[in-house]
Amino acid sequence: MKRLAVFSLFFIASLLIAEPLTQEQMIQKGTEVSTTLVQKLGNELKTQMQTGGPIAALHFCSQNALSLTDQVAKESGTAIKRVSIQNRNPVNAATFEEKAILNQWQAMLKNSETLPAYQLTKLSNGHTVYYKPIVINKDACLKCHGDIAGDSPLAKAIKETYPEDQATGYKMGDLRGMIVVAF
Ligand code: HEC
């Protein structure tokens, strides 16, 4: 019992004095966590598209994308979100600072420049954030984010679930948004 108490004390103390992550560690962790999230969402999406088609997959995403994201965040001890300027889910709207980065990347694409794999930025509040571009890189993305016929059942389902949807009209290679990982 006493040993347990001493151990607990050390454990709590080590948490309190834990060294902040180095830049290298943040890059490594950010890359790891964002890859996990993309894989997790991608696998679910693929399964749902194959078994139920785009409308079922749409409903699955609207009900589970955020909780799957939270799960990855919890497991990694970070905060993660996906944001976009042309967002579908209002929760995923980019902030002012995030828009500035997305606009910068948008301009790079326009100039046929290659996007960085990630960007690490120290915010004015002292926190460092890892950003990773999300590009439309699969035909499957266009099913729900491309040109969708206005009178199709899918268009209706999108409109019902997301009356403010802005996330259609994308083409292959377009910047769709980014993953934001905060430490
Ligand atoms: C079955 C339809 C469907 C497909 C296919 C699909 N998405 Fe989405 N997407 C959604 C829905 C619904 C949301 C909103 C719910 C959420 O994920 O938070 C969304 C949201 C997003 C967001 C978050 C920003 C926002 O607009 O809310 C990104 C980024 C995104 N999708 C990228 C992609 C990419 C990249 C692909 C291809 C790999 C893809 N999506 C394929 C339906 C789809």
Predicted regions and their residues:
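Short, cysteine/histidine-rich loop/knuckle motifs that typically chelate Zn2+
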Residues: K143
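Sec-dependent signal peptide recognition
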Residues: K2-F10
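Short Cys/His-rich local motifs and their 1-3 flanking residues in nucleic-acid-associated proteins
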Residues: G146
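Extracytoplasmic c-type cytochrome modules immediately beyond a signal peptide or single-pass transmembrane anchor
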Residues: A18-A140, A149-F183
